[in-house]
Amino acid sequence: MGNEGMNRRALLSGGLAGALTLGAPLWAAAPFASRRIAVNVRGTGRDVVLIPGLASGPGIWNGVLAALPTYRFHLIHVRGFAGLSADANASGPLVQPVADEIARYVGAAKLSRPAIVGHSMGGTLAMLLGLKAAASRIMVVDMLPAGAAMVGGTASGLGFLADQLGGYLTGTLAGRRYLAQMVAQTPGAKGSDPEVIANALRDLANIDLGPQLPRLAAPLEVVYAVGADAAQASAITSRFRADYAGKKGTLLKAIGPSGHMVMADQPTRFNAALGDFLKGI
């Protein structure tokens, strides 16, 4: 994959640059207390859990809420992202504890195996929930089973580097300033805690769900972004096919030209794909 394609998918620059706040919808807070997530509920109908990605808030799904009004959406907001205080996410591992907390919410709200849709890091969380048998079906948006693969690495190879990078970003004054500047300059990431972002990046670089895909019982659909360059789009498609081969029956859909935030760059096509996916619940 060319440098442009790799840069587009960088977990830090791509995830942060795509963390758009598209306005604040009207919603009702769910009666659920958590030090790791907040949940808001919008609409009535069959249950769908929406999980945003790195440094993003639930505003990334505003277009979905408007386009698909016949579902009850449970919007996850990870603490430490997009203006929400970090609380228990302020230090230590993030991804698995957040997945556990979303699973706790599903049980507390008495949701019967809802559809779960996750973008970027949210896609990783969606797959982790699927491995807990908490989902009836799963849509992953522009994420590979191994977070490190999004930048051309592996969990074993990039994991060590991510540990070092995480230590630099959170343990040194220069690193904290650098990450804070990136957050401040990125639309939608403002209000995100740099240390929470660094911890999330470290977790993602060390997670590889590829070997566990055969255990994923729920139907899986993966929507991924491709650019206008045909050769790069072909390389991206080949990578997604190879990396999701462990889950038989996975439906892969390319949407482009698009950057990482498919729902913002191609809203009509994304909402149509999501609408078709949700017909299965």
Residue ranges and their predicted role:
Residues N3-S13, A17-P31:
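N-terminal twin-arginine translocation
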Residues V41-S85:
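Conserved HGGG/HGGXW glycine-rich cap/lid loop of the alpha/beta-hydrolase fold
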Residues P114-A149:
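Conserved hydrolase catalytic core segment
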Residues Y224-S258:
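Conserved loop-alpha-helix segment in the C-terminal half of the alpha/beta-hydrolase fold
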Residues S258-Q266:
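Catalytic histidine-centered segment of alpha/beta-hydrolase-like enzymes
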